[in-house]
């Protein structure tokens, strides 16, 4: 497992521990190294992780390294963001989204 700042890299091996069994709500980004839009979201995701430390666990999964996870959640386009509570997928967004949209899919601005 690699951690970039406050963002945890998730794979099929550690998904259960990092996402399904997480005590905090989780925001999981599905991305690909070759994806330009994913690169555009990296600063937004890093800011979200920093500002929500201790309230939301931020993770990311590379669809090329963990295709089973992408398939399990029906991810066909990247970047894709899915929020989890109690290990269950809740809300999702796809594409380049503003910071506020990440708050909204995590249920932080209802």
Question: PLM features: residue spans?
Answer:
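Short pre-active-site segment immediately N-terminal to redox-active cysteine/selenocysteine motifs
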Residues: 23, 31-34, 77
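Thiol-based oxidoreductase modules, predominantly thioredoxin-like and allied folds used
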Residues: 9-10, 30, 42-49, 53-68, ...
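N-terminal targeting signals for export/organelle localization
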Residues: 1-6, 47
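Structural cue for short, hydrophobic secondary-structure segments
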Residues: 29-31, 83
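A short beta-strand-turn-helix
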Residues: 8-25, 67
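CheY-like receiver
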Residues: 18, 69-72, 105
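Non-catalytic, surface beta->alpha helical segment in thiol-disulfide oxidoreductase systems
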Residues: 77-110
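Short, thiol/selenol-centered motifs that function as redox-active sites or metal-ligating centers
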Residues: 34-41
């Amino acid at each position: 497992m690699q951690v970039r700042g406050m963002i945890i890299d998730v794979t099929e091996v550690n998904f259960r521990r990092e996402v399904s069994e997480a005590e905090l709500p989780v925001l999981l980004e599905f991305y690909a190294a070759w994806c330009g839009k994913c690169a555009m979201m990296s600063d937004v995701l890093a800011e979200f992780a920093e500002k929500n430390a201790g309230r939301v666990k931020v993770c990311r999964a590379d669809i090329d390294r963990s295709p089973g996870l992408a398939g399990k959640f029906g991810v066909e386009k990247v970047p894709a963001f899915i929020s989890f509570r109690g290990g269950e997928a809740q809300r999702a967004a796809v594409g380049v989204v503003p910071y506020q949209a990440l708050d909204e899919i995590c249920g932080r601005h209802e």
